[in-house]
Every structure is written in structure tokens, then in C-alpha cells.
């Protein structure tokens, strides 16, 4: 199903501006493969204009408009944005759905989370005022010291296509709460709702240049943003390969980065579980958002005593999933985002089969859907740890399975990856869950569930899944620079040097 989409330009300095080179990129509905509109394609020239606007926003009126304004002032704008997002939720959810293929119910949930995230960081912006000049205890009573928390400055925010508006908000909301000025570069595969965020900012009167939104290709817009000398920090969510390039570029300017990269997360299921409850979490953990989740628990590690029955149950659950146009009522699996992603996922499945794995279910296009980038939920068994399907991130509705006999073996299998974003364990033995939780090498651990995410809790990985934390108070700290202020308060001279002789 196709619906009309707004025609937008780049959002720079509080207004809509055509790209300097007047380039545009077609928008393809992944459910119908139809071109439904286009978005502007920014280049280096537009990045320069946007960065200049952001710099001006920080210094306008000696910073009083934004950077040095109270957190309470910034909070009012964030709450106004949240209210507008809630007001526009129906149309935003539909745009998200036709842009990236996400089922409409999921998209609506995401938009609720967008509003909630802006509200949360409005609260933290207000609390930031009380954290200023926090005293530092010193061992010498001739000095007193305090800490200031100041905005890092101009920040480049590069975001993915699987949660277009939500993951943009994970960066935009704390950056603005901190007093930074931002340039948001969303993925060219799903930018529609991010452009609508620009319209919302205009409607609420956000000061010009505080948030600039540049759509476009990575090499043409993302790379110039990451390497721009006047961008003080880059925050990126996406592939490990691109994250590595951003780190390399930032190193030349000694620029801080925070990176949330790929994953190949495990879900360990022990023998003492309720099979149906565990089966639902297993499919939710891998097939939510059409399987396109950086933290997807796409490696299912089953106790050997329940493996056969568990897989039988999970296949029955999968057969009950409604695969359809994401705007249809009750859809629980839509298309993957693009033709390129569709072909990549099918290649993973083909390689697994050629390496000796078994396709237990799925692995191809659903028979009832002749158009669109749809792939059936897929389970792959008879997997070995040297296979590509075990080691590499698929980013699609594909679950690979191995069995274990001991807790130690389960932990070894779970940690057998270069990634470390998420990990999950399901067991009725909570002491065992605690042991396994401590043994997991991951930044996020779920116990008796998979994938729940809350704005209040930190999000980020270890190993090649990146570093830095988003969300919670940690997300705000990402965009703050800590300044130490120490004052000598004694009336006595310092007395380290011999004073010159008096004349």
C-alpha cells in the first residue's frame, strides 16, 4: 500500500533549503517496490553550510539562546517537540512503515518512544542546572573546587534505517538537552520521519541552527560530516566497517566518537523453561523489526534435552506470524528495507546451506507475496561455529541454532563472537541466570526475555560492537564536557618562591 509523502528539502538553520547541487534520491516502498517520492541528497557543500549554522547557534547572543541557556529553557523546547510528535503520531507511524517496511503497530510503538525520549531528556536538562558547580572535596582547605558540565559543541549524528526516527531521537534529544547544536544525517534508506522532525522543530520555534537535518548518501554527506574540522564530536550507529572508518577519520583531528555497531547476540535457553514462553521470546528476539535489529538474539543456544521439542514449538509459532504489507492490520513481519538487503540475506541463507547447515523453515520469499522485499522467518540448524551464519551479522529474519549440554559450554558458545552488544538467558533458576549474566561478554543482558529497551537504562556494547553508552543519564553525559574549576581561597601568599627583596 502506498500513501502520499511530503516533499521536503534539507533542514538548515531553521528553514528548508534545497541542496547546493540540487540532487535528490528516490524513496522506494519496500512492500510494493514502487517509487513513492524522493528526498534531498546533501553533499559536502551542504555540510559546510549546516556546520556553520550550528556554530552560529552556539554563539548567538553570547550563547544565551542555547549553549549557555538554562537547562529549564532547553527543556521547554524538548517538551514541545514531544507534544508535537504525539499529536502527529498517526501520520508519522505510517511514514515510518512505508519507508522502512516496519509493521504499523511497531512503528506506532516507536513513535510513542520518540515522544517519551524527548520528555525524559527534558527532565534531565532541568536536573542539569542543579548539577552545575557540584563541589569537589579536596585535601587542602586553602582551595575549593567545583565542576561545570558544558556542551561539547557542534555534534554530528549519523543514524541507521531500522529505527529511523527513534534512533535519531536517542542522539538528538540528549545532545539538545546538553546544549549542543547538532547535524543529523539519517540513512538514505529511511529518512522521511527524520525530515518531519525538522518540520516539528520549525513549528515549536527551536532556535535556528540548533538542529540541522541532512539527508543523503554516506560517502557524499556522512563522510564530510564525520571529517569536518568544526564538528566537535561524532555519534554513529551502524555497521562495524563504517564505524571503523569514522574512528580513523576522527583520530586525525583527535575528535571524540561514540559508536553503536553490529552484533551477533546469543539467546541461551536452559532445560527448565516453559517452552511456549521461551519460544515466543526467541522469535521476538530475532524477528522483531523484520529481524533488522543490531541487538537481535540471532544465535539460539538450546539445551540438548529440549532442542527437538523446542524447535517444533518455534516452527508452529512462526507459521502463525502474519507476513504482509506493513500497513495491514495484524502484520507482524513486513519486508526488509531494500533490494540490496533482501539479496544479502538470501545470500547468507544460501551460503549456510552450501556449508552444510539445514534450513529447518523459511529461507525464501513467502508464496503469497509476489512483490516487495519479503523473506520468511528462517531457522537454520546443524550449524558449526566456523560457519558464516554463526559468525557474521545477517540483519534479517534469520535465526541459527546450536545445542549445549553444560552451563560452561553454553557460556563458551555465547561468547564465541567478536561482537558484544546484547545477550540473553532464559531459565527458571535465577541463581544460574545470575552466573550466566556475569559470564556474558556483552553490554546489555536480558534475563527471561529478549530485546526490551527503556529510555532510562544504558544502551551500548563491548568488543567490536562499539563503545560509549546511549540512553539514561549516560546518554546525556555523551554530549557534556566536564570542566574543573579550582580557586585559591586563602588570604596568605602561596609562599613557594622566595619573594624578591623589598626596595
Swiss-Prot record:
Primary location recorded for the protein, binned into one broad class: other
Reactions catalysed: 3-aminopropanal + NAD(+) + H2O = beta-alanine + NADH + 2 H(+); 4-aminobutanal + NAD(+) + H2O = 4-aminobutanoate + NADH + 2 H(+); 4-guanidinobutanal + NAD(+) + H2O = 4-guanidinobutanoate + NADH + 2 H(+)
Residues binding Na(+): 28, 99, 189
Signal peptide: none
Motif (Microbody targeting signal): 501-503
Domain of life: Eukaryota
Binding site for NAD(+): 161, 185, 239
GO terms of biological process kind: cellular detoxification of aldehyde; glycine betaine biosynthetic process from choline
Keywords: Metal-binding, NAD, Nucleotide-binding, Oxidoreductase, Peroxisome, Sodium
GO CC annotation: peroxisome
Primary enzyme class: oxidoreductase
Active-site feature positions: 260, 294
Pathway: Amine and polyamine biosynthesis; betaine biosynthesis via choline pathway; betaine from betaine aldehyde: step 1/1
Family annotation (Pfam families): Aldedh
Subcellular location: Peroxisome
PROSITE patterns: ALDEHYDE_DEHYDR_CYS (PS00070), ALDEHYDE_DEHYDR_GLU (PS00687)
EC number, UniProt record: 1.2.1.-, 1.2.1.19, 1.2.1.54
Site (Transition state stabilizer): 162
A GO molecular-function annotation: protein homodimerization activity
Family statement drawn from the similarity comment of this UniProt entry: Belongs to the aldehyde dehydrogenase family.
Function: Dehydrogenase that catalyzes the oxidation of several aminoaldehydes. Metabolizes and detoxifies aldehyde products of polyamine degradation to non-toxic amino acids. Catalyzes the oxidation of 3-aminopropanal to beta-alanine. Catalyzes the oxidation of 4-aminobutanal to 4-aminobutanoate. Catalyzes the oxidation of 4-guanidinobutanal to 4-guanidinobutanoate.
Quaternary structure annotation from Swiss-Prot or TrEMBL: Forms homodimers.
Protein name: Aminoaldehyde dehydrogenase 2, peroxisomal
